[in-house]
Amino acid sequence: MNLDLLTAISPIDGRYRGKTERLADYFSEYALIRYRIRVEIEYFIALCELPLPQLKDFDYSLFGRLRDIYLTFDEAGAARVKEIEGITNHDVKAVEYYIKEQFDAIGGLEPFKEFIHFGLTSQDINNTSVPLSLKDALCDVVVPQVEELIKQLTDYAEEWKEVPMLAKTHGQPASPTRLGKEVMVFAYRLQKQLDSLRQCELTAKFGGATGNYNAHHVAYPEYDWKAFGNKFVSEKLGLVREQWTTQISNYDCLGAVLDAVRRINTIIIDLDRDFWMYISMEYFKQKIKAGEVGSSAMPHKVNPIDFENSEGNLGVANAVLQFLAQKLPVSRLQRDLTDSTVLRNIGVPLGHTVIAIQSTLKGLRKLILNEEKISADLDNTWAVVAEAIQTILRREAYPHPYEALKALTRTNHKMTEETIHQFIKELNVSDEVKAELMAITPHNYTGI
């Protein structure tokens, strides 16, 4: 059976491939190999620039051709690496051998080939390649989609800023609010957590077999290898080098990044559920597309499927993000191999995340505001002005105002405009205060 959209096991690579395809440039096996080659090549160039004595005669004009090894790397190249891995049974060693083949193709580089992967362990490559790919994926794909969602919410908040709406706390009528303000709550929350994500450092482990530069130091004790590593990771890769490690990354900062993404996802789940409720309450209708079917049995159905799809995908994403953030920082002694297979799954929750964000955006863009229903609910819930009345009566030193309004409104009898106004007329307050109270309605008692 050939692998395609219909035979893929994961819906990320099957049903939803159209939404996640860009992530293949960062988290596929091909992408991981390309990032590994990039780190190996840049490391070799950095050794030349140092320079190590054996590399001082390397022709700097060839740096461009070296970088072309990863810049022009394609699926055929990746297939060759996998072919080599079939012999070595070691993925990073296969990358090293592939690069040596490319050096041979350039020609004249035989004296320099043994400085490919010099002094390094596999995790010096993996623990730079993975955070580098994550950094690029967040910058190029995930963050722009979150920004697009924030922009859509901000636009709606402005459009609906003057639309009064009955609030619900504990599922019951509460002091009125404005629809635009409630939408802005989500834009504000997402922006705060997006800022938090941007502040997270993406760190890398780079220090040899057990994090001490043993091989580097024994071969060239005259060099400051920590300073070299700091500069290489920062200037060549745009990451921050972890100063104290075992053979592998501490993964604490990676965990913080994943937790930051999870907080963003949690806010979107909250958004999805609220808009699902607003649609259920008929505060919004949904645009109907000709030919679409809402139910295999009930022809009339127009379901909020986009928000439901988003919520489901975010649930999967957050479960994996939480597992990754909790598992990766834990490794036996100087390392065990459990992080290796786990790291390969970083793209999975991000795939579900981008599917979800696109679904939420699709759902939002199908909304049709039903002001008539929103207004009718306000007209039907005059009890919510009780807070306003009792607060003004407190200001006027009226005796037991809260209790008076409680006795009036906390019953099983419906409160109407007439009921409220009759209560106000019977109050022992000035005509000016009565007029002030009479002016309060569920439509204008919306705060600031």
Question: What do the PLM-derived regions correspond to, one by one?
Answer:
Residues 135-143, 147, 154, 184-187, ...:
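Short amphipathic alpha-helical segments with heptad-repeat character
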Residues 1-213, 220, 224-232, 294, ...:
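A helix-coil-helix interface module used to build multimeric assemblies
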Residues 2-29, 64-65, 71, 293-448:
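Catalytic-core signal marking the mid-to-C-terminal active-site face
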Residues 158-161, 202, 276, 283, ...:
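Alpha-helical coiled-coil oligomerization motifs
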Residues 223-247, 251:
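Active-site-adjacent "gating/activation" loops or surface patches in catalytic cores
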Residues 104-110, 198-199, 280-283, 318-322, ...:
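Proline-centered turn/helix-capping motifs that create local helix->coil transitions or kinks
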Residues 193, 240, 246-332:
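Glycine-rich anion/phosphate-binding loop at the beta-strand->alpha-helix junction
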Residues 42-47, 98, 102, 137, ...:
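Generic, well-ordered alpha-helical scaffold segments in large soluble proteins
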